[in-house]
């Protein structure tokens, strides 16, 4: 499941997710439940059996404190009654739109809730601050750089995501009243990532896996059997969603791509990009 904002880049990237879902054969064992801003015309979205579209106002528009933080929309829909649309499923992958399922996604069946990996807690300042907050909130910190994508039992992911939202609000109120900070140090721009790490350790403790999701799109290794889901990271290395958006892949010889290689697979699925 994912949220499609009324943004042409996100709408285009949702197309990547759908094409990868089809090519990888994931459509055989899963459905896509896509929540979207009401302004998004579903006639502009892929029509495939197994895809359900549910309109819902963006969380950032309905809650003034998040007006300048659209990333909250990828979580906010879990707090609405409409999330009941996923309740009949056993498991769910909560993902962003700018992602690619691999042919191995069909084999993902972990015993524990599985997260991807992030890259927001590399500076000592950030690691220390997260540990201090965890202690203040009564959380035992174990992991760092827990990713944004998560796969697990539906009821667990719904509960976890609502805790995640609550922690986003707490961080906003306690840590970012007087400024936004500066990347790669303590920075409001990745507040939802900090909150996700704290929420994961609060709710799951040690009973979680990290890996197999949010694989680096810039990797030039072959897709491994435990690479289930690739994320388009913020990078100008191939594969780069920024270069894709700006048309820098328009002249690429697609016949020369090797879709068994992670970076090439992403471009092969995404296509040449906008004119």
Language-model region placement:
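Short, flexible, basic/aromatic active-site loop/helix in glycosyltransferases
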Residues: 127-140
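Catalytic core and acceptor-binding pocket of nucleotide-sugar-dependent glycosyltransferases
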Residues: 140-235
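N-terminal anchoring/stem segment of glycosyltransferases
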Residues: 1-70, 81-89
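A structural signal for short, well-ordered beta-strand segments and their strand-loop junctions
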Residues: 33-34, 92-96, 101, 207-212
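GT-A fold catalytic core of metal-dependent nucleotide-sugar glycosyltransferases
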Residues: 72-125
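A structural signal for well-ordered alpha-helical segments within the folded catalytic domains
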Residues: 12-15, 19, 72, 76, ...
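Short catalytic/ligand-binding loop motif for oxyanion handling, primarily in non-cytosolic enzymes
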Residues: 10, 41-44, 100-104, 159-160, ...
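Long, low-complexity C-terminal extensions of enzymes
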Residues: 215-275
């Amino acid at each position: 499941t994912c949220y499609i904002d009324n943004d042409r880049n996100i709408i285009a990237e949702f197309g990547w997710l759908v094409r990868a879902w089809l090519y990888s054969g994931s459509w055989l064992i899963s459905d896509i439940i896509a929540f979207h801003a009401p302004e998004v015309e579903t006639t502009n979205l892929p029509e495939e059996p197994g895809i359900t579209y549910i309109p819902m106002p963006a969380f950032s528009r309905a809650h003034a404190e998040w007006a300048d933080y659209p990333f909250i929309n990828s979580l906010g829909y879990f707090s609405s009654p409409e999330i009941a649309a996923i309740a009949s499923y056993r498991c769910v992958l909560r993902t962003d739109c700018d992602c690619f399922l691999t042919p191995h996604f069909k084999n993902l069946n972990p015993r524990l809730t599985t997260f991807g990996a992030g890259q927001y807690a590399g500076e000592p300042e950030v690691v220390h601050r997260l540990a201090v907050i965890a202690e203040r909130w009564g959380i035992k910190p174990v992991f760092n750089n827990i990713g944004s994508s998560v796969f697990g039992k539906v009821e667990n992911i719904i509960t976890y995501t609502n805790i995640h939202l609550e922690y986003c609000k707490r961080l906003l109120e306690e840590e970012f009243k007087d400024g936004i900070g500066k990347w790669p140090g303590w920075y409001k721009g990745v507040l939802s990532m900090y909150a996700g790490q704290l929420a994961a350790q609060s709710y799951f403790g040690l009973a979680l896996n990290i890996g197999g999701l949010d694989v680096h799109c810039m990797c030039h290794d072959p897709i491994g059997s435990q690479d289930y889901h690739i994320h388009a990271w913020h990078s100008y290395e191939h594969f780069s969603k920024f270069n894709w958006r700006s048309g820098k892949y328009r002249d690429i010889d697609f016949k020369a791509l090797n879709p068994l290689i992670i970076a090439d697979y992403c471009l092969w699925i995404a296509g040449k990009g906008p004119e």
